[in-house]
Amino acid sequence: MIRKILTTLLLLICPYIAAQESDVELPDFVITGKDIVNIGKTEKIPPDFISTISEIFLKPVFPTENLQMKEVNTPIKGSGALTDSLNYLTGSLNAGLGFYSLPKADLNFSSPFTNGIFEGFAAVDNTRAYVENSDRYLINGGASLSLYTDDDASFLPGTQFKFNGEYNTSAFKFFASDNPSFKRILNNGNAYFGMDNLMGKYFIFSAKLSDDNLDLKNESFTENIFDISGFAQLTLPAFDLGVEANYKKQILTNDYMSGNKINFLSTRPTMGISLSPLVNITLGFNYQHSDSNNFFSPYAFMSIYFSKELSLYGEYSPQAEFWGGGHFLQSNDYFIAERFSNIFFKKNTAFSAALKYEYYTYVEINGGIKYYKSDNQPYFFDTTAGMFDLATIEAKSYTAFVNLLFHPGPGGIFYATAEANNTKDNNGNTVPYFPAAKVTFNYGYNFTNNLETETNLTYLSGIHTAINSENTLRPYINLGVKLGYQLFPDFYLTFKISNLINHNNYIWQGYKELPMDLTAGLNYRW
């Protein structure tokens, strides 16, 4: 089946590809946030290197809370200077008070040096109650150290190393439950080490090690996830050989077990072939194992460059994933994690395709489709009001998406995403809490040198609340505006309005989101 699909696709596109230019290059600069950092020209990463059509590949990492602060990525080339931009910022301090934010502050700083950069952040966000017992707070902080070697270094040339640590604590109440004053305190810490070298002509690799610990204070849930992952790719004259691997170890304490240990192993060996300078295919298999669960499936990926601007990607990748309680707590604060251990989530069939248009580093438009079928699709349901458990069901999921990315230019900066989703079980029931439509956009523009503006929108609709019910939450509409006015060098007066139209928003049944809120503050940059 896969061979027929690939053959048909090749017959359709090969005559067109043969007429195109074969040289595909990156420009001499990369836009990272507000400013431009010159890092020296590098070779374009071949399309077969991107072996999965992922969220990271297609969507930007967009710091909406900190537009003015430049996100500095460690240069790959040793000749790149981290501070070669005239407007380079090494720090930003924001502090503000609002109708419900009392107080809100965040600090970001960086200290670049030869062959590296040290970065840190800290934040506090205290929200007072807008309905009874809806008050909450968040405190977090972290630091990272990035190091890289020169391309001509005698030891591991062109290699990057990153050390990172982060800790946060948050507290909130189950204000839509039968016990509205019940307070959850969630503590989460993470330590990370990574190294990679993507500049090798014949061999590239990446390895990451992390340890994530999550604890619910005064609740019987503690989870530690130790995670090792990596990939390597060897380029030979006729083909490429690659392998991706991931090992996880969960140590869990909950209502039913204490210190229970579960292992998860995933691997994907592949072989890539270039059918032409612009057409690449990768074949292999996925294998996952955990306890008594095993999953095996063939894997196929194809990438095509029609031109410098236009490329097509397709992937067939059934696989299994290992998710613990911490994964679901990231999605739903009100998940009763102490009754859950983990899930070996299987996508028995899965494929995706995306078409991507790029104009240098200024404009990117991509869109496509995703499909998967699972015999144990997890979903949230409330056993009692305001408290959510997990169940699984056999389901199919169809998604169409488009992403619009207009990076900083004369017209400002604009990022937008739109997604339509249809996830249903075998009886045609919509799986709860899978929005049928999602739209987000952020637009920033500086009207003058002293006035910065940003408009953002989040829209969700078609959120069902039960598997056998047509009851849906009302559409979620959160329109926001941010203004920054320069009082004098390095100091800005800031205003932020969230939920501008004061819409009654809900993401989870019964839990009303923040109403219109105005926050005013100061921003100091250095």
Report residues per predicted region:
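Short sequence motifs at beta-strands and strand-loop junctions characteristic
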Residues: L97-S101, N133-Y137, F155, S181-N187, ...
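Exposed, low-structure sequence patches enriched in small/polar residues
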Residues: L93, A123, G284-H289, N293-S297, ...
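N-terminal periplasmic/intermembrane-space "pro-region" immediately following the signal or transit peptide
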Residues: A19-T83
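Surface-exposed extracellular loop regions of Gram-negative outer-membrane beta-barrel proteins
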Residues: S110-T127, G242-K248, D255-Q288, G409-G411, ...
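Short loop/turn motifs that connect adjacent beta-strands in outer-membrane beta-barrel proteins
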Residues: L82-L89, T114-G116, D150-Q160, N197-F203, ...
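Outer-membrane beta-barrel transmembrane domain signature of Gram-negative proteins
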Residues: K183-Y192, K208-V279
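Flexible loop and strand-edge segments within Gram-negative outer membrane beta-barrel domains
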Residues: T127-G142, D152-K201, D212-I225
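Outer-membrane beta-barrel translocator/receptor signature
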Residues: T74-K77, D84-G141, T159
